Amino acid sequence: MTDIKYKRVLMKLSGEALAGDKGQGIDLETVSAIAEELKDVHDLGTQIAIVVGGGNLWRGEPASKIGMERSRADYTGMLGTTMNALVLQDSLERAGVQTRVQTAITMQQIAEPYIRGRAIRHLEKGRIVIFAAGTGSPYFSTDTTAALRANEINADAILMGKNGVDGIYDSDPNKNANAVKFTELTHLDILQKGLKVMDSTASSLSMDNNMPLVVFNLNTPGNLKRVVLGEAIGTTVTGEK
């Protein structure tokens, strides 16, 4: 029997990951490829929950900076995450994986409301659960949503797949050829060094609850499965030493 390191995970999937090379919008081929990666991990027996972002469709904070009321801008972004969630759900179900979408804002015609106990029950029954609409409140990022939901469902770790970046660096490796990669960090390191991984609210919540985080390159086929099996790829972030 395959030795699985993480038996229940919270996958943080950025909206940009669904855009592929386009950089914005939704690329259905890219979404289908991600769904196949998730299916491979699901087939191992790992329980998977997903928090999906919406940056490929909308960003609330920049909109607020040019005059849009911040709460309204953030709520618009929550609708974007729901669009992404429904597209991902469709790809997963076409791949043969039963999937449920739960939203933090009630949209009963298209998804279940977020109910912790029901989400855990879905996971126990072998369904993938996608959490959409953030926390349901403005001013909170989907990174913070990921940290919150991971703790609520008692996940073993948060898995954060990046586009073309294979871990956490001391500076942007796409802009600095001499950027240094970290293989291990603590959440306190991230806060003290000001590393751009998660926002400080998400990092603090993860640190306070000793929630591990693994950051890896989602674009490399099989990487998600390797992380779940415990291979040392990307960067692993743990509680304070």
From Swiss-Prot:
Residues annotated for ATP binding in this entry: 12-15, 55, 59, 163, 169, 172
Keyword Kinase: yes
Alphabetized Gene3D superfamilies for the sequence: Acetylglutamate kinase-like
Keywords: Allosteric enzyme, ATP-binding, Cytoplasm, Kinase, Nucleotide-binding, Pyrimidine biosynthesis, Transferase
Subcellular location per the Swiss-Prot or TrEMBL entry: Cytoplasm
Record-level Gene Ontology MF annotations: ATP binding; UMP kinase activity
Pathway this chain belongs to: Pyrimidine metabolism; CTP biosynthesis via de novo pathway; UDP from UMP (UMPK route): step 1/1
SUPFAM superfamilies: Carbamate kinase-like
Main location: cytoplasm
Sites where the protein binds UMP: 54, 74, 135-142
Family as reported in the entry's similarity comment: Belongs to the UMP kinase family.
Subunit structure, interactors included: Homohexamer.
Protein's name in the database: Uridylate kinase
Biological source species: Leuconostoc mesenteroides subsp. mesenteroides (strain ATCC 8293 / DSM 20343 / BCRC 11652 / CCM 1803 / JCM 6124 / NCDO 523 / NBRC 100496 / NCIMB 8023 / NCTC 12954 / NRRL B-1118 / 37Y)
